[in-house]
Amino acid sequence: GPSSSGKTTTTIKLGEHLAKSGLRLVTLNVDNYFHDLEMHPKDEFGDYDFETPQALDLPLINQHLTALLNGQEVQLPYYDFKTGKRSEKTTPMKLESNEIILIDSLHGLYPEMTSSVPEEMKFKLYIEPLLQLKDNEGRYVRWTDIRLMRRMLRDAAHRAYDPTQTLLHWHYVRTSELRNIIPYVNTVDTIINSAMPYELPLYKAKLGDDFARWAEQYKDDPLHQDAYERAERV
């Protein structure tokens, strides 16, 4: 599912339910499969694009998935985000008979992510906050705006990101979602709605003044019209 849809929280809850049946989720952390920066794709502004699935070493992911499903041990890579390179350090991994591989990723539905795995061995789950709520003018609240506010608070709390940075970066996120995630929603086995109606009052209390300020700040800035439109809408 898209950014800030609740994938990690859902993963924890899913693992707890499966454990009651004697099964165990084993996460394949695809963040460790990023290409070294010199091999990394760039966007139209020359910035490194971490939002695209092509930023990942898809052949190696498939190689490891095939080996794991065949009962073999693999050496999982480790990506050092400080150096922008894959470390020489690796971690061994081998599946037990009661273990299920979980790919917790923005791009879990992207066909090339699991092209080596037979379809009958996959269960595809999509998650997004599908809130059915209208504003005072009768317009539905956009799901992408909910996720934007979630990510602002998460990035500020856990990554020391100023919410302004998250807003200015969001058009990259949204472009990748529309290109690499949304087209494959119709291939999933089930959809989870992670919307919580009580979210919006909390976000208003924490971010309401900021959105008003951003709308005024970027109103006449031709380079940040996406940020202005999102801030004005929220």
Locate each region found by the language model.
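P-loop (Walker A) phosphate-binding loop of NTP-binding proteins
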Residues: 2
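Glycine-rich phosphate-binding loop used to anchor ATP phosphates in small-molecule kinases
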Residues: 62-121, 166-184
